Regions:
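Active-site-proximal, well-structured secondary-structure segments within enzyme catalytic domains
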Residues: 168-198
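Alpha-helix termination/capping residues and helix-transition junctions
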Residues: 140-142
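Structural preference for beta-strand elements that scaffold enzyme active sites
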Residues: 145-149
Length: 198
């Protein structure tokens, strides 16, 4: 492959007391996935925390967050591992903290646990030449390919799809440097860091 990869970002929303800045959010930190390459051990790539306020859009069931009001408060975060809950594939963690009471009415937090995996950066300038070389190897070996198919780009994630849900939602997104650069080039520099936009 290209030797480049991104990170999987696992997210969970929680409550924050705007008076004290107290928050506490639990989630299952992933430890091992199994996919087309076999089992892989997931590497912890850190936790980030953002404070925000969501507002109800009148007359609709939707909530909205002003992206400019999202503030990173990772410096307040502590991660507690519940050792008794650790299994080969996951462990329960609590991300909690206090502080930044000066942030006004921001009464929610967004916790992002990142993981390193060997998945390729599909948006890297090296990706297309690598894939062309791979197809050429098949042709040189006498294998004629009429088409290539994949029902999901991220076949390198995990086959246990429903173990990655929080509150009924698939709570993981793959972000690579190449993807972030493509978005930033097209939509603005603020998209060079995707974590708060998940």
């Amino acid at each position: 492959a290209t030797g480049e990869s991104g990170v999987w970002m696992h997210y969970r929303k929680g409550l924050r007391d705007p008076q004290t800045g107290n928050y506490s959010v639990q989630l299952w930190r992933q430890r091992r996935w199994a996919n087309n390459k076999g089992p892989i051990d997931i590497q912890d790539a850190g936790v980030r925390v953002f404070a925000f306020r969501e507002r109800v859009m009148g007359g609709t069931p939707y909530r909205v967050v002003n992206p400019e009001s999202i503030v990173e408060i990772t410096d307040t975060a502590q991660v507690e591992v519940w050792e008794g809950s650790t299994t080969p594939i996951a462990q329960r963690i609590r991300v909690h903290g206090t502080g930044h009471a000066d942030l006004g009415d921001r009464n929610r937090v967004f916790v992002v646990q990142s993981y390193r995996t060997p998945e390729m950066d599909y948006f890297s300038p090296k990706a297309l030449p690598y894939l062309q070389q791979l197809v050429d190897k098949y042709a040189e070996a006498g294998v004629q390919l009429n088409a290539l198919y994949s029902d999901e780009m991220h076949i390198q994630q995990d086959w246990s799809y429903f173990q990655h849900h929080d509150n009924g939602e698939f709570a993981l997104r793959y972000v690579s440097p190449g993807l972030a650069k493509a978005y930033a080039d097209q939509f603005g520099a603020e998209y060079s860091d995707f974590a708060k936009y998940l």
